[in-house]
Structures are given as C-alpha cells and as structure tokens.
Amino acid sequence: RSGERKNVVMNGMAAGLTDADIDELADWYAGQPWVIADNGNPNLVEEGLNRAGYCHACHGMKGYPVAKDWPILAGQSALYLDNQLQAFKSGTRYHPHMVNVVKDLEPSAMTALASYYTQLNGAAAPQ
C-alpha cells in the first residue's frame, strides 16, 4: 500500500485494504495447499542451475530466501518466474537489487532460471 512496489493492478487493489484485510488475505493464501510444479525440461533446469549462483546469495541454494521478506522461488510457476524476471528487466517491476541482476540476462537465461527454480520442492520450507 505504500507504493514502494509498483504494480498497476496490485497498487489499486491494495489501496483500500485495512491491515486486518491484509492479515486475513495472507492467512487465507498461507492455508492453501501447495501445487507441485512440473519438473520441466531437464536441459533448461541444468542451465538454470549453472546460472543460479548469483541468485543463491539472496534466494538460497534451494530457492528459500536468506531474509524473511524476500520471495521463495522454489516451486513457483516457471511462467510466473520468467514473467517477473522480464518485468524487472523492462522496468515494469522494480527492486534495487534485481535491476542489476537482470540487466545482462537474455530471455533464454531467464527461462532457464525459471525452469530451475520451478522444479525445486516448494511444498515445505527447510528446517
């Protein structure tokens, strides 16, 4: 709601929500069953793993972030992850760290990274 994260759809939707509304939505989403993603193309997964070294610094070796406010990548939809990387590169989504991460990534590298992270098990966070 602060407007720090720019998204035309979500900024408009969140503007009218109270803190209680947001808490209720978060609880509802947290209670939904995890859908196991397709393991994807093995060649793309391997390429993604080879390119993910820089990603591991923030998102962890298994796609679980080192900071609680950063997103879990493990098990996310490949299409969603690919779209988010493209949005960071085009400037339609902004995060100060991600701008530098994606600036030299080609679309094929984004697809490979998305394929790698989608096949990781996102059903339960590591203990």
Residue ranges, per PLM feature:
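Axial heme c-ligation environment in periplasmic c-type cytochrome domains
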Residues: 1-22, 29-32, 37-42, 67-72, ...
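Generic structural signal for short, flexible, solvent-exposed coil/loop and linker residues
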Residues: 2, 6, 47, 59-62, ...
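Hydrophobic packing within well-folded, soluble alpha/beta domains
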Residues: 25, 55-58, 113
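Sequence/structural segment immediately N-terminal to covalent heme-attachment motifs in c-type
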Residues: 37-64, 76-77
